[in-house]
């Protein structure tokens, strides 16, 4: 994968041991695939390894700050997506787990992450028993801008989400959640304000603990 300065500021922790996957399972809300799939990959931003190399060469590293967390996070997520694409090309199924950010402090303790290393996401990997339908996406014009950012009108927002909002899946979700539109499923049930703030505070504290907020 592309990497800042060819520094490879990431680590991929491959967990195949069942006991360790069972220990990590509560961090991912006990989703069955965490234990049932044969391989769990925790993707980490990592300035620790490069910092050690610099120090052992009498160089003065300065990567214990937020700018280099962002560089390391970019490196790590680029590597993660390349791993996911390569796995799928070889017939494996993958699933990203956003729960990593929810419980990053606990994951860091279980995986014994040193200073300068924080978890970003987790990929569950294995040979699938089924072939689920592809998840729908917004049309390309929703995410591609030419020359400059082009803001959206209210009518354009309606048009971009129309297919999602009219799908059978959305109708089923609205019935299950007792809500009148898809947006409220996200804001009231899936990603609530109070949860978002709690996760943010927890992750900022982990970044501070791991040395990414030094001035």
Q: What is the predicted function of each stretch?
A:
Residues 1-215:
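Acidic, surface-exposed loops and disordered segments
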């Amino acid at each position: 994968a592309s990497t800042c300065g060819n520094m490879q500021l990431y680590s991929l922790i491959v967990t195949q041991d069942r006991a360790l996957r069972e220990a990590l399972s509560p961090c991912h809300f006990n989703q069955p695939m965490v234990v049932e799939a044969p391989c769990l990959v925790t993707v980490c931003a990592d300035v620790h390894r490069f910092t050690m190399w610099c120090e052992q060469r009498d160089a003065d590293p300065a990567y214990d700050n937020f700018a280099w967390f962002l560089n390391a996070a970019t490196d790590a997520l680029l590597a993660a997506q390349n791993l996911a694409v390569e796995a799928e090309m070889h017939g494996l199924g993958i699933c990203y787990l956003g729960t990593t950010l929810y419980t990053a402090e606990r994951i860091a303790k279980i995986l014994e992450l040193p200073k300068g290393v924080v978890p970003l996401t987790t990929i569950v990997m294995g040979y699938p028993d089924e072939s689920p339908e592809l998840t729908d996406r917004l049309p390309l014009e929703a995410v591609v801008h030419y020359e400059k950012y082009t803001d959206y009108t209210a009518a354009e927002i309606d048009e971009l989400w129309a297919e999602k909002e009219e799908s059978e899946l959305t109708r089923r979700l609205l019935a299950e959640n007792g809500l009148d539109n898809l947006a409220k499923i996200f804001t009231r049930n899936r990603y609530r304000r109070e949860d978002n703030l709690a996760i943010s505070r927890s992750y900022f504290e982990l970044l501070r603990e791991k040395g990414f907020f030094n001035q």
